[in-house]
């Protein structure tokens, strides 16, 4: 099946939000959004970060407990001699686990290479569709999606200056939404160093991971910065939900073009 794609034109904005020029986006930004592939690729990328865990092979077994036998009117579970306290069995206090987690368990969800490429391209295309961006809950007043800024944006080294730029391009409301979303996590995660959870805000895609904006923007709640060479579904569709509000620099668009255009015979 062949799909006829049409290129999209978007405006390049300066640091004050004024339009400088119009450029054509790479053709893959017009690709149909495949939610199923985005979800599969996200799960594959996410599970790669999981750490295998196991149990001590002797956990719950460091005891001399043996069953007292039958005809005593008590359960035949292993018991410690002298005290008669039940031990060792899975249904006893301090006993072994029946099926403990093992390090051999396969944690990574595998995905085909072509599906992975299509999933990333679909996630990129969703950032250029205002319907997906709004459906994800982002708040913005800009008419251009995705938002493309001049390369000078990568040299900003102060978070306050970045906030002024986000305000000029109509994205500052999304930062307010992120700040309002911060709350205490449900469950035991709050005992394990994950007490608070917070929403995802704008994603900034730059051409160089050593740019000053990488560190300065990390001080803004909900904002993530990633280079165009490393951007993946993890960044573009957190939780497997496509349509993250994304800000690109002009140079990063060219890097994405070299990375993806022509790889899938678009």
UniProtKB/Swiss-Prot annotation:
- A GO CC annotation given for this chain: ribonucleoprotein complex
In which domain of life is the source organism classified?
Archaea
Q: Pfam families of this UniProt entry?
A: Ribosomal_L4
Q: Which GO terms describe its molecular function?
A: rRNA binding; structural constituent of ribosome
One GO BP on record is: translation
Which keywords does this Swiss-Prot/TrEMBL entry list?
Answer: Ribonucleoprotein, Ribosomal protein, RNA-binding, rRNA-binding
- UniProt cross-references to InterPro entries, sorted A to Z: Ribosomal_uL4, Ribosomal_uL4_dom_sf, Ribosomal_uL4_euk/arch, Ribosomall_uL4-arc
Keyword presence, Ribonucleoprotein: yes
The entry's function note states: One of the primary rRNA binding proteins, this protein initially binds near the 5'-end of the 23S rRNA. It is important during the early stages of 50S assembly. It makes multiple contacts with different domains of the 23S rRNA in the assembled 50S subunit and ribosome.
Question: Assembly state and interactors?
Answer: Part of the 50S ribosomal subunit.
Family (UniProt): Belongs to the universal ribosomal protein uL4 family.
Q: What is this protein called?
A: Large ribosomal subunit protein uL4
Q: Please spell out the taxonomic lineage of the organism that makes this protein.
A: Archaea, Thermoproteota, Thermoprotei, Sulfolobales, Sulfolobaceae
Gene name of the encoded protein: rpl4
